[in-house]
């Protein structure tokens, strides 16, 4: 992303959440603020009837729908697990690379004692906070923590906040690892493992090697790679599940669950009339710290 502006891919993800909420029956993930969170350009597209009809046509639901499924599926999964974690006395929630997620307006009222930390690039945060304040009152339980993932660790960033290290925490890290070098992703997970309390949980999505994909999945992944390259946010990070598992287990994490695209589709998109499903190009990983 360019200095002084918010992430273009975060804007695109918000647009996909907005379209899914506004233009599908029985949305997998409901984000009534997503439309206002995205850019003027995306708002114009989502307000053009012909574009909306095309975006939600059967042929695009089978292609673009893979990307929509990825975006809304990961958010639904993370918040389902967060809800379970809070019931088991998790008291802190860290959104790593929070993007334009609207949790603080959508759901924070349901978790009045949950301390929320949004960690992201300062330019994305500045644009986001401006939009959030126009849409509603921010709860006192949220704190915005700036970070440059390539230059500092998450522990260094959270050390500047009210984050309590001895308190078990739920970390949600969505839509970010794809744009980071694999070493940066692993260093961030290692940093979490070193400073987070035992019992803390992490949910993240990650890309697999698109060279191993076939048909529309492979073409779609190549198309997304070209699109993000044009946005100046190229895809950099891919992992083999077995290699990633081995790396995080050495850090002290237990792999609770690693869902393939097919498993996510089975859980959240089964038998949908609109044929939206989750891509096979990315997976969802649930970790628990057990040092």
Q: PLM features: what roles do these ranges have?
A:
Residues 235-261:
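Short alpha-helix
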Residues 217-234:
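Short, glycine-/aromatic-enriched active-site segment of Class I SAM-dependent methyltransferases
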Residues 163-184:
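A short SAM/SAH-binding and catalytic strip from SAM-dependent methyltransferases
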Residues 154-165:
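Short amphipathic alpha-helix with an adjacent loop that forms part of the alpha/beta core around
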Residues 142-144, 153-156, 179-197:
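A short, conserved alpha-helix within the catalytic core of class I
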Residues 267-291:
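Core SAM-dependent methyltransferase catalytic element
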Residues 189, 194-211:
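Conserved beta-strand signature within the Rossmann-like core of class I S-adenosyl-L-methionine
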Residues 1-94, 100-145, 153:
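Rossmann-like AdoMet
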């Amino acid at each position: 992303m360019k200095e002084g502006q918010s992430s273009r891919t975060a804007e695109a993800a918000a647009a996909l959440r907005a379209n899914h909420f506004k233009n599908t029956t029985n949305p997998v993930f409901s984000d009534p603020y997503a439309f206002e969170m995205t850019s003027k350009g995306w708002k114009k597209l989502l307000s053009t009837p012909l574009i909306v009809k095309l975006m939600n046509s059967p042929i695009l639901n089978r292609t673009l729908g893979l990307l929509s499924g990825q975006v809304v599926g990961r958010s639904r999964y993370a918040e389902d697990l967060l809800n379970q974690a809070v019931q088991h006395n998790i008291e802190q929630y860290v959104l790593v690379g929070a993007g334009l997620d609207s949790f603080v307006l959508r759901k924070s009222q349901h978790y009045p004692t949950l301390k929320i930390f949004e960690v992201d690039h300062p330019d994305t945060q500045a644009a986001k906070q401006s939009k959030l304040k126009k849409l509603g009152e921010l709860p006192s339980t949220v704190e915005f923590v700036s970070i440059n993932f390539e230059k500092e660790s998450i522990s260094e960033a959270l050390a500047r906040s009210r984050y309590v290290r001895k308190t078990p925490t739920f970390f949600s890290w969505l839509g970010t690892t794809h744009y980071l070098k694999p070493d940066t992703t692993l260093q961030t997970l290692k940093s979490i493992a070193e400073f987070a309390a035992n019992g803390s949980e992490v949910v993240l999505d990650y890309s697999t090697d698109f060279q191993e994909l076939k048909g529309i999945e492979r073409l779609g992944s190549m198309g997304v790679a070209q699109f993000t390259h044009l946005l100046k946010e190229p895809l950099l990070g891919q992992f083999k599940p077995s290699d990633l598992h081995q790396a995080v287990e050495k850090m002290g994490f237990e792999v609770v669950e690693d869902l393939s695209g097919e498993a996510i589709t089975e859980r959240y998109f089964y038998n949908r009339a609109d044929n939206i499903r989750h891509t096979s190009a990315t997976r969802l990983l649930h970790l628990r710290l057990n040092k």
